[in-house]
């Protein structure tokens, strides 16, 4: 058993039950599952492999909820970064975890921009553009945007279950 199989089972048993409610958005378990599979597929197409670290810095939005499933679905390890940390600490975490991808809410553009100046490795940035708030004052951080990136995935992607209980899915 893993959180991934719990999601799969919940989707099968309660497909039309509400799973996530956030501001003007809500998703059923079936929709959450499909979004997670598509995002995992998009990460796979990006080159994320088993054991790679994908960091996330976001508020409690549907995107971070989905990340907790979609990142392990591709065999990668999720590294959720505390939203209250300063740029120096975020930089250390990104460097030390050897993050390949960073999914980040644009509201953290100041912290992340400063943090990335001290990170030696190249990190692919995926911006979360929260459509339920005014983001006009938040600068774009990366080249990719979460919803567009998600839409590039395949909802029929054959995601990877952990090989055993020792395979890491989170830091």
Task: List where the protein language model places each region.
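A short N-terminal helical cap/helix-turn-helix that marks the beginning
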Residues: 1-19
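Hydrophobic/aromatic residues within well-ordered alpha-helical segments
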Residues: 10, 35-36, 119, 166
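Domain-wide signal for the mature, well-folded portions of proteins, strongly enriched
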Residues: 12, 26-30, 94, 115-116, ...
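Conserved pre-ATP/AMP-binding loop-to-beta segment of ANL
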Residues: 15, 127, 143-144, 150-171
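Conserved AMP-binding/adenylate-forming core of the ANL superfamily
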Residues: 16-61, 65-69, 86-91, 142-148
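Structural core segment of the AMP-binding/adenylate-forming
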Residues: 45-46, 73-148
């Amino acid at each position: 058993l893993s959180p991934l199989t719990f999601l799969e089972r919940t989707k099968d048993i309660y497909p039309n039950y509400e799973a996530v409610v956030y501001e003007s958005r809500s998703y059923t378990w079936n929709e959450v599952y499909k979004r997670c599979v598509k995002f995992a597929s998009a990460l796979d197409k990006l080159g994320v492999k088993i054991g790679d670290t994908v960091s996330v810095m976001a508020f409690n939005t549907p995107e971070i909820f989905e990340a907790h499933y979609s990142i392990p679905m591709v065999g990668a390890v999720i590294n959720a970064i505390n939203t209250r940390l300063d740029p120096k600490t975020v930089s250390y975490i990104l460097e030390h975890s050897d993050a390949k991808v960073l999914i980040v809410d644009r509201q953290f553009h100041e912290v992340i921009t400063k943090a990335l100046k001290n990170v030696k490795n190249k990190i692919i940035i995926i911006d979360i553009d929260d459509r339920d708030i005014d983001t006009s004052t938040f600068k774009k951080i990366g080249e990719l945007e979460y919803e567009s990136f998600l839409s590039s995935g395949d909802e029929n992607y054959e995601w990877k279950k952990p090989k055993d209980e020792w395979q890491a899915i989170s830091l």
